[in-house]
A protein has these predicted regions:
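N-lobe entry segment of adenylate-forming
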Residues: 1-57, 61-76, 161-177, 201, ...
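Conserved AMP-binding/adenylate-forming
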Residues: 55-57, 70-118, 255-257, 510
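Conserved adenylate-forming
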Residues: 73-79, 192-206, 210-254, 348
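AMP-binding/adenylate-forming catalytic core of the ANL superfamily
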Residues: 94, 115, 122, 132-134, ...
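AMP-binding/adenylate-forming catalytic domain of the ANL superfamily
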Residues: 157, 531-554
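Conserved AMP-binding/adenylation subdomain of ANL enzymes
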Residues: 231-251, 259-302, 306, 310, ...
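Gly/Ser/Thr-rich phosphate-binding loop
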Residues: 299-302, 314-377, 386
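Conserved ATP/PPi-binding loop(s) of AMP-dependent carboxylate-activating enzymes
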Residues: 380-384, 396-428, 450, 456, ...
Length: 567
C-alpha cells in the first residue's frame, strides 16, 4: 500500500483513479432542474428532445409546452413552494409537468400508479397537494384517493394525448376509455391560455421532487430531492471519463415510469441534460421491451433484470442484431454475478458494443450513486460521491476489504423524509460539515475502489446453535440457491422460532415445475455443501413468481407473512 494511504475508503477514495481532474473538480450546476436542462440544450432548440410513438418533439416545442403547462398550473393557483401530485407514466405530459412545476418553484410529488387508493390518499394529504394530475389509466384509484383530501382540482390526461393522430385514433378505438368526471387535459391547458405565470429565482437547495421508497421492508416514505441533488446525477453521468459513451443526438429508451426515482433522474433528466433523444415508452412491462428496443434502435437503455430476460427469450427464436447498443444499464433485485455474466455474453454475442452496465443507488440518493463501466460490471462511486463502511455493532469505520454497513455522502443525497424527521435522523448524520446517509446495505470497498454489495442489514436473521448466536445472511443463501441451473429466481426470509431465533425459508421460482422434486433435493445438498448449518433452509417452496411491491421489487414482507402463517 502507498505510504500516504490510510486504508480507509472515505479518506483514500481509491475510485478517483478512474476519473479525470475535470470530473473531480468541475463545479456542479447551480439553479433548478429546469435551468440546467435548458442550459444544456440552448443551442439545440431544433433538435429532438422527445420521441413518442414516432412523433418527435423538438426542444423548442418542449419549451413551449413547459410554459403552457406552467400557465395552466398558475391558473389552478399553483405557486412557489406548493406541491403538485402527479400520477403518470412515461408520456410527454409527464416531462412537461416535471419542468413546469419546477420552473414555478413548486414541487412535483410523483405518486406510484399501482399503489392502493388509501396509500395514494395518505400521500396526497401528507404533501398538502391541492392539484392532482393523473393518467387516465389511474382515474379510478385517484378518484377514490382524493375523497376527503386537500385536493381541489383533479386533471386527467390520456396516454393518447401526444400520440400521432392515426395512432391516437386507433388507440382510443381499442382502449374505449370510459367517460371521465375529472377535468380534461385540454380544459386544463385552455384555462391557462391568458395567464401570466410567475417564475421565481430557484436555487439548487430548493426542493424539486418527492419520490417514494420501495417499501420492501417497511411502509413507503416520501423522499424530498433538491434541485442540486437531481442535477448532480445528470452532471456526473456526463463526467464518467468515457466509461459511458453518450453522443449528442443518440436515442435513450425510457421504459421506467417516473414514479421511480430512477425513472425521473436517470430516465428523464439525465438523457435530456446529456443531449440525448428521449424515447418515451408508457408501457413498462418486460414483455413490451424487446419490441420497442428493436423498433427504435435506441443506443442507450435501462431497466430491470426482467426486461433483459425477456429480450434473451425473444432472441432465442429470432435473429436479433444489437450492434446499435452502446449502454445497457440495469439495476434492481435478481442480478447475481452469474446473471450479469450470462447477459453480458448474450449482448456481446449479438454484437452489442457493451456488456451489462450495473448501478447502485436508492431513492434517498436520487436513484443512483455508483455505476459500472461498459468494460466491467464492478461498480465505482461517481467522482463527487464518498463512501465509508462502518461496523454494524460499534459504528466504527472499517478499512478497505472489510465488510460492514455502506454509508454514503455526496451532492445527490435527499434533503429529508417528508414529515418524518425522526426517521430522517435515524439514517442521516453530519460529520465535519458533511452529510452522511446510512444505506442499510452490507458490503465493502475493494482496494481497487470497487463497491461490493453483500446483503441487506434489515434482512439479517439470527439463529442459535448450542449457546452461540449466529448471524444468518439471506443474500448469501440466495446466491447459493441461484447458482443452480434450474433456478430462475429465489428469495429467502426467516420464520420466528422462539428463543432459537429464525428458521430459514426459501421461496424458489424454478425454470420447470415438473423438475421440482429433483431440484429440491439438489438445492438441499448444495446448501449443505456451501453454507454453515445455521443457514440451511428448513423448507423450500416452489412458486410461479415472487410477490412484488408497487415499485416492482421483491416483497419480502409478503413472504415473511406467508412463512409466519405456515403450520
Amino acid at each position: 500500500m502507498n505510504e500516504n494511504m490510510t486504508g480507509y475508503p472515505s479518506i483514500d477514495k481509491p475510485w478517483l483513479k478512474y476519473y479525470s481532474e475535470e470530473a473531480i473538480h468541475s463545479p456542479l450546476p447551480d439553479g433548478s432542474m429546469y435551468d440546467y436542462m435548458t442550459a444544456c440544450n440552448e443551442e439545440r432548440m431544433n433538435e429532438p428532445a422527445l420521441n413518442y410513438f414516432g412523433r418527435k418533439i423538438t426542444h423548442r416545442k418542449l419549451q413551449t409546452e413547459i410554459d403552457r403547462c406552467a400557465r395552466a398550473l398558475s391558473a389552478c393557483g399553483v405557486k412557489a413552494g406548493d406541491v403538485v401530485s402527479l400520477c403518470l407514466l412515461a408520456i410527454p405530459e409527464a416531462v412537461y409537468l416535471l419542468y413546469a412545476v419546477n420552473k414555478l418553484g413548486a414541487v412535483a410529488n410523483f405518486l406510484v400508479l399501482n399503489a392502493t387508493p388509501q396509500e395514494l390518499h395518505e400521500q396526497i394529504i401528507a404533501a398538502k397537494s391541492k392539484v392532482v394530475i393523473t393518467v387516465d389509466l389511474a382515474e379510478k384509484q385517484i378518484t377514490e384517493a382524493v375523497k376527503d383530501s386537500c385536493a381541489e382540482q383533479v386533471i386527467s390526461v390520456s396516454l393518447a394525448q401526444s400520440m400521432p393522430t392515426v395512432t391516437a385514433v386507433l388507440f382510443r378505438m381499442k382502449a374505449k376509455p370510459a367517460p371521465t368526471t375529472l377535468t380534461s387535459w385540454n380544459s386544463f391547458m385552455e384555462a391557462g391560455k391568458n395567464v401570466d405565470a410567475i417564475y421565481p429565482a430557484n436555487t439548487k437547495e430548493s426542493a424539486a421532487v418527492i419520490e417514494y421508497t420501495g417499501g420492501t421492508t417497511g411502509k413507503a416514505k416520501g423522499v424530498v430531492i433538491s434541485n442540486g441533488a437531481a442535477n448532480s446525477v445528470a452532471f456526473q453521468y456526463k463526467c464518467t471519463n468515457g466509461h459511458l459513451l453518450f453522443s449528442k443526438g443518440e436515442k435513450f429508451l425510457d421504459i421506467l415510469p417516473p414514479f421511480y426515482a430512477y425513472g425521473i433522474f436517470v430516465g428523464i433528466h439525465t438523457p435530456l441534460c446529456n443531449c440525448l433523444e428521449n424515447v418515451l415508452i408508457p408501457d413498462p412491462s418486460p414483455q413490451n421491451f424487446p419490441r420497442v428496443l428493436l423498433k427504435y434502435r435506441a443506443q442507450h437503455f435501462t431497466g430491470g433484470p426482467l426486461h433483459l430476460n425477456k429480450l434473451v427469450e425473444y432472441a432465442r427464436h429470432r435473429h436479433v442484431d444489437l450492434s446499435f447498443v452502446k449502454t445497457a444499464a440495469f439495476g434492481g433485485d435478481g442480478m447475481s454475478e452469474e446473471w450479469k455474466a450470462s447477459t453480458t455474453d448474450f449482448l456481446k454475442s449479438h454484437r452489442a458494443k457493451c456488456g451489462i452496465v450495473t448501478g447502485y443507488g436508492m431513492t434517498e440518493t436520487a436513484g443512483t450513486f455508483c455505476t459500472s463501466t461498459c468494460q466491467s460490471t464492478q461498480m465505482i462511486p461517481f467522482a463527487r460521491n464518498n463512501i465509508k463502511v462502518r461496523d454494524i455493532d460499534t459504528e466504527q469505520e472499517l478499512l478497505c476489504e472489510q465488510e460492514g454497513e455502506i454509508c454514503v455522502s455526496g451532492p445527490s443525497l435527499m434533503t429529508t423524509y417528508l414529515n418524518h424527521p425522526k426517521e430522517t435522523d435515524e439514517v442521516m448524520w453530519a460529520e465535519d460539515h458533511t452529510r452522511w446517509l446510512r444505506t442499510g446495505d452490507l458490503g465493502y470497498v475493494s482496494k481497487d475502489g470497487y463497491l461490493i454489495i453483500t446483503g441487506r442489514i434489515k434482512r439479517i436473521l439470527w439463529a442459535m446453535s448450542g449457546d452461540v448466536v449466529y448471524r444468518v445472511y439471506p443474500m448469501a443463501i440466495e446466491k447459493v440457491i441461484s447458482s443452480h441451473a434450474a433456478v430462475k429466481q429465489c428469495a429467502v426470509v426467516g420464520k420466528a422460532d422462539g428463543e432459537r431465533g429464525y428458521l430459514v425459508v426459501a421461496y424458489v421460482v424454478p425454470h420447470r415445475n415438473d423438475e421440482w422434486p429433483q431440484v429440491q433435493e439438489e438445492l438441499a445438498e448444495l446448501c449443505r455443501k456451501e453454507l454453515p448449518e445455521t443457514s440451511w433452509p428448513y423448507v423450500y417452496h416452489p412458486m410461479d413468481k415472487l410477490p412484488t411491491t408497487p415499485a416492482g421489487k421483491v416483497d419480502f414482507r409478503a413472504l415473511e407473512r406467508m412463512a409466519a402463517e405456515e403450520s
